[in-house]
Amino acid sequence: MAKAKTERRLKDNEAQAIARTLRVSPQKLNLVAALIRGKKVDRALAELEFSRKRIAGTVKKTLESAIANAENNHDLDVDALVVAEAYVGKSITMKRFHARGRGRASRIEKPFAHLTIVVREVEEKGEAA
């Protein structure tokens, strides 16, 4: 029997947004998630704006949701936010069939993925007085 799943606790300076059941393979989604990991949110939004990947628009909406959660629910400063974590999970796989020659059929698998983005407020290191 498996252990009970424990939810990840957010710290006081963090906020998150989750997009579930996205119609893209986890491998392709992870390419876009790796693009924004560790970057400041304004830089990450710019990267997603000009990315040519199809799923980049959905990732951008999820990041904007995480920023809005940080501002409205957790009272964090938007200018000091960085993308602390952006991780991808595997979801369901739809099975479809494709008719082939001689009366045969082959299976087509259409994968789905989950995306979780955690933004964290950081203090500026060298502030000028």
UniProtKB/Swiss-Prot annotation:
Query: Known SUPFAM superfamilies for this protein?
Result: Ribosomal protein L22
Q: Which GO terms describe its biological process?
A: translation
Q: Does the keyword Ribosomal protein apply?
A: yes
Specify the superkingdom: Bacteria
In alphabetical order, the GO MF annotations are: rRNA binding; structural constituent of ribosome
Keywords on this record?
Ribonucleoprotein, Ribosomal protein, RNA-binding, rRNA-binding
- InterPro entries linked: Ribosomal_uL22, Ribosomal_uL22_bac/chlpt-type, Ribosomal_uL22_bac/org-type, Ribosomal_uL22_CS, Ribosomal_uL22_sf
Which cellular component terms (GO) are annotated to the entry?
cytosolic large ribosomal subunit
Show the Pfam families listed in the entry: Ribosomal_L22 (PF00237)
Presence of keyword Oxidoreductase: no
Which family, according to UniProt? Answer: Belongs to the universal ribosomal protein uL22 family.
Subunit architecture: Part of the 50S ribosomal subunit.
Q: Which HAMAP family match?
A: Ribosomal_uL22_B
Q: What does this protein do?
A: This protein binds specifically to 23S rRNA; its binding is stimulated by other ribosomal proteins, e.g. L4, L17, and L20. It is important during the early stages of 50S assembly. It makes multiple contacts with different domains of the 23S rRNA in the assembled 50S subunit and ribosome.
Name of the protein described by the UniProt record:
Large ribosomal subunit protein uL22
Native organism is Agrobacterium fabrum (strain C58 / ATCC 33970) (Agrobacterium tumefaciens (strain C58))
